[in-house]
Amino acid sequence: MSYLLRKPQSHEVSNGVKLVHEVTTSNSDLTYVEFKVLDLASGSSYTEELKKQEICIVAVTGKITVTDHESTFENIGTRESVFERKPTDSVYISNDRAFEITAVSDARVALCYSPSEKQLPTKLIKAEDNGIEHRGQFSNKRTVHNILPDSDPSANSLLVVEVYTDSGNWSSYPPHKHDQDNLPEESFLEETYYHELDPGQGFVFQRVYTDDRSIDETMTVGNENVVIVPAGYHPVGVPDGYTSYYLNVMAGPTRKWKFYNDPAHEWILER
């Protein structure tokens, strides 16, 4: 199995709380992005104290209450399945604060982390405030829910987005990268992909590769898998009959998403 691919686990961290994924700077090649997925049984709680990190808590499915002990957001979350294809609620919390998540119903929660030293206000990112985009043409169509885009000044370094790609389409395509700190041409952003498939027995293909091929990994990615993108191009292909969802987390030295297309495939945009 590729070192960039993580499969789900089910490790109980406390009563009613299971850890599904944990990507950290110590167990991956990432420096800026960390990521967790938790399953919370109804009535259970998870607490954590942030140090020099900010977090975006995404209510992937189910309903939760989130508090940093100054602000409390009750009964947030909008869907039982990501394939209802409607935006969800999220909460941004800045560094050096503690938070608690309580499950109002059975819930899956994504915790998206990046470095931060400047405190910013805690914020509820309402589902209706997610910017929705329809990108691409031909067989490269996808729908994007912008949870925490670079146009939103609510965070110091964190970017968070959900993407839906229909049967037979490609996403993050033509292949693009953002691994050079060379603005205005390109920004350096690490990235993680948390994938779900409908139906759940499906899979997608994702390739991560650099110009010099020091990274060149092509992966068969199953439901609830995570792909780590420390650098390089990272397209996703969705087979016929299945729908793809993924949650992206990005962060780097500058909070700007400026990508560079693979010149070998950029002609696709000129059709």
Swiss-Prot record:
InterPro entries: Deoxy-glucuronate_isom_IolB (IPR024203), IolB_Bacilli (IPR023770), KduI/IolB_isomerase (IPR021120), RmlC-like_jellyroll (IPR014710), RmlC_Cupin_sf (IPR011051). Transmembrane segments: none annotated. Its EC number is 5.3.1.30. Signal peptide: none annotated. Pathway: Polyol metabolism; myo-inositol degradation into acetyl-CoA; acetyl-CoA from myo-inositol: step 4/7. The keyword Isomerase applies. It comes from the Bacteria. The keyword Isomerase applies. It catalyses: 5-deoxy-D-glucuronate = 5-dehydro-2-deoxy-D-gluconate. One of its GO terms (molecular function) is 5-deoxy-D-glucuronate isomerase activity. Disulfide bonds: none annotated. GO terms for biological process: inositol catabolic process. It is an enzyme of class 5 (isomerase). It holds the Pfam family KduI. Keywords: Isomerase. Involved in the isomerization of 5-deoxy-glucuronate (5DG) to 5-dehydro-2-deoxy-D-gluconate (DKG or 2-deoxy-5-keto-D-gluconate). PANTHER family: 5-DEOXY-GLUCURONATE ISOMERASE. Belongs to the isomerase IolB family. This is 5-deoxy-glucuronate isomerase.
